[in-house]
Amino acid sequence: MQKIETFWYFCLKHFKQELNGQQFNTWIKPLKLEICPDVENTLVLIAPNRFVLQWIKDNFVNRIDEMAQGHFNEKIHFKLELKDPAEIKTATIKAPEPKSKEDKKPPTDKAHGTTARKTNPSRLNPAFTFDAFVTGKANQLARAGAIQVAERPGIAYNPLFIYGGVGLGKTHLMHAVGNYVMELDAGAKIRYVHAEKYVSDVVSAYQHKSFDKFKLYYHSLDLLLVDDVQFFSGKNRTQEEFFYAFNALIEAHKQVIITSDCYPKEISGLEERLVSRFGWGLTVAIEPPELEMRVAILLKKAFIEKIELDESTAFFIAKYIRSNVRELEGALKRVLAYSRFTGHPISLDLAKEALKDLLAIQNRQISIENIQKTVADYYKIKVADMYSKKRVRAIARPRQVAMAIAKELTQLSLPDIGEAFGGRDHTTVLHAHRKIVELRASDPGINRDYSTLIHILRG
């Protein structure tokens, strides 16, 4: 097999064109291809950890195999292996678990937590774990990145920057990393801090002339978790202190995880030197959950809370509550409260009754005409352009955005949506939706526009 280097170069080139940069750098670039010394006509695909290994196995190994059969003149077999033999050999997508029983901390007292957590200096929420986090297409990359960081803090991706709308699970993932690291090392110095609290700490240090104490604490952490960093906007002294803390931790190979409601470069009032450093590691987005994921979230929440919830009721709630996980869980609590108040078990009819006011508000506010006018005004085009046959990008792209939003926010069928856009067929609507999903993953500007329009329409 003299052409192995040529073959792997061909594979990398192919996947680089097919995937966006973030996906390619996370899943494909870390792979290595070698000839198996023990088995004839066999190539070994080496992954850096078990999560990349599982993802490649699920998504790309068959594709690579097909390309190999077309490249070589002989039948080629593939083996998947981990780079470090000491790592767990079984490819699984389960949440991280302690490496051995000896590594585990004593059982947690539910009333007080473990000895290390009685005062909870870390500010971690023990309920936010990887096991409690429901995974779907909207968040799988962010979860995979968080798990890799949890297993190799300070090494895998530093910093890890997670961005997305309110209530999508950014804080949950951040706490999950902290809880996992704490589970492995009860003595680890971990601090979760909301950006507003960090600002408050800076102000307090300024007032009491205690910056030495402030720096000693934040610069000595093993894991710093900063939530909603957009609140640093315009606060120059806070940004300066965080810049020093960030540098100190990164240089010491200590992990930093940051969340924001938008892409780092879109945070106004943030110093360029911070924006640049936020891009040193891995930046991942969390999108609003798709229908199947919303159903899974409801069923998991019901299981944890010991609530009887059948799939049809969960599907009904998930179908109409689409913005974020927080509102989804809020709707479930409302249904549960109504059930307890009336003394009737949770059912589809009860859920419809409990949520009728909420659903009426949503249905009244969002119509396809409202979507078309809002999108047209936003992009400064005519509403008539939504129905026209014009294909220039300045008109076609807003039209695709409007179709995608209509699919997400209304209950209209694809043919009905197409009819509302100048008699287009359902395949045009489906193509528009898929195109916008792709662009939101690769183009921060489109993602920002889409999120802003959703926010405007939902009021």
Swiss-Prot record:
Annotated region described as Domain I, interacts with DnaA modulators, given as residue ranges:
1-74
Give the binding site residues for ATP.
G167, G169, K170, T171
Which residues lie within the region annotated Domain II?
A: 74-122
Give the residue ranges for region: Domain IV, binds dsDNA: 340-459
* A biological-process GO annotation: DNA replication initiation
Q: Which segments show compositional bias classed as Basic and acidic residues? A: 96-112
Its GO CC terms are:
cytoplasm; plasma membrane
Q: Which UniProt keywords apply?
A: ATP-binding, Cytoplasm, DNA replication, DNA-binding, Lipid-binding, Nucleotide-binding
Q: Please state where this protein is localized.
A: Cytoplasm
User: Pfam families, alphabetically?
Assistant: Bac_DnaA, Bac_DnaA_C, DnaA_N
Q: Which InterPro entries match?
A: AAA+_ATPase, Chromosome_initiator_DnaA, Chromosome_initiator_DnaA-like, Chromosome_initiator_DnaA_CS, DnaA_C, DnaA_dom, DnaA_N_dom, DnaA_N_sf
| Major location (coarse) | cytoplasm
**Region Domain III, AAA+ region, residue ranges:** 123-339
The record, for Gene3D superfamilies, names:
1.10.1750.10, 1.10.8.60, 3.30.300.180, P-loop containing nucleotide triphosphate hydrolases (3.40.50.300)
Extract the GO molecular function terms from the UniProt entry: ATP binding; ATP hydrolysis activity; DNA replication origin binding; lipid binding
Disordered, as annotated region = 91-123
Notes on the domains: Domain I is involved in oligomerization and binding regulators, domain II is flexibile and of varying length in different bacteria, domain III forms the AAA+ region, while domain IV binds dsDNA.
What this protein is reported to do is described as: Plays an essential role in the initiation and regulation of chromosomal replication. ATP-DnaA binds to the origin of replication (oriC) to initiate formation of the DNA replication initiation complex once per cell cycle. Binds the DnaA box (a 9 base pair repeat at the origin) and separates the double-stranded (ds)DNA. Forms a right-handed helical filament on oriC DNA; dsDNA binds to the exterior of the filament while single-stranded (ss)DNA is stabiized in the filament's interior.
> How would you summarize the oligomeric state and partners of this protein?
Oligomerizes as a right-handed, spiral filament on DNA at oriC.
Family statement: Belongs to the DnaA family.
Supply the name of the protein.
Chromosomal replication initiator protein DnaA
Q: Organism source for this protein?
A: Nitrosomonas eutropha (strain DSM 101675 / C91 / Nm57)
